[in-house]
Every structure is written in structure tokens, then in C-alpha cells.
Amino acid sequence: VGITVKSGRSVFTYARIPIGTATQELQALAEREYEEVGQKDLDRLNVDWARYGELDAAGKLATFIAKRDGMIVGYAAFIVQTHIHYQDALVAANSAVYAVPEVRAGRVVLKLLRFAEMGLKAQGVQKIYYHVKQTKDFGRLLGHLGYEDVERMYAKVVRDREVG
């Protein structure tokens, strides 16, 4: 189930999908995302599609896509589960969000995130969390959608790199 929107000469479709139905297309986009903002201090990109599939089968994954003229041009994936500190609250934590540069100037990302929010809310999610990379900060867009900047995330690689 999705919605279709005509924008100029293009037709955009926003939908929620089982992740297993589009892993090849999503892999290609994940590689583009990795080139732009990936954590190069870790090993190469190696998406665990099997684990995503397990989460999806367990009802703990929500994957939303934007298509332009039948091709996926953006995605937003969320891990959905009860909050470990508030077990009565179903929450969604954004696992990944990406749109190809060619569609970012329009409202594709805005519409994708709104569609995802509607879908998550319909599922019973009470709170949605996004993590935002400093190198591709879309916090202004999230603020426009009513989200608040509530905490920061810090990271450090603690294992030595293997030389070889």
C-alpha cells in the first residue's frame, strides 16, 4: 500500500515494503550512501540483509521507500520495538535514511519521512528517533516536521586496524 504523487514530469510513489522484496535495489543505494557518509573507520560496507529479514519477519522492522518512475530513489528503515526503559512504549529507531542526490532538491525526503511517520503511527509507534550524521545534517528538516534535538551520539573505534 502506498501513495502516488505527480511532480513535474516524474511520478513518485511512497510505500512500505517487506525489505526482502527489494534488497538488490536497496543494496545499490546503500553503497551510494556509504560513499557519501559511511563510517570508513570500520570495515567495508556489508549490510546484514538476513538480519534485516529476520527483524522484518518478527514485525520489528519498518521499511519505507520512495520511487521515481518505478525506481527506488530513497528509503527510510526503522527498528520497531518496545523501549527498554519504558516497556509499555513502542518506539521506532531510524536504522537508515537516504535519498539519491538527484531528488534532494525537491520534497521527496520530506514526503518520505511524513509517509514513514504516518505508517509508524498506524502501527502503534509512540515515539520515533532519528540519528543524524554531522556530515549530512538534516536536522532542520526534522525540526520542520516537529522533531526535537534531544541528545548527541559519540563514537570511538576501539579495536586496532589489521595491517595487511
Segments (PLM) and residue ranges:
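A conserved beta-strand-loop-helix scaffold within acyl/acetyltransferase catalytic domains
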Residues: 40-63, 67-68, 76-87
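Short amphipathic alpha-helix that is part of the acyltransferase structural core
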Residues: 2-46
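A short, internal acetyl-CoA/4′-phosphopantetheine-binding micro-motif in the GNAT/acyltransferase core
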Residues: 95-106
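Conserved beta-strand-loop-alpha-helix junction that forms the acyl-donor binding cleft
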Residues: 128-139
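C-terminal "cap" of GNAT-fold acetyltransferases
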Residues: 143-164
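Short, high-confidence coil segments that cap the C-terminus of an alpha-helix
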Residues: 61, 122-125
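Conserved acetyl-CoA-binding loop-helix of GNAT-fold acetyltransferases
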Residues: 104-118
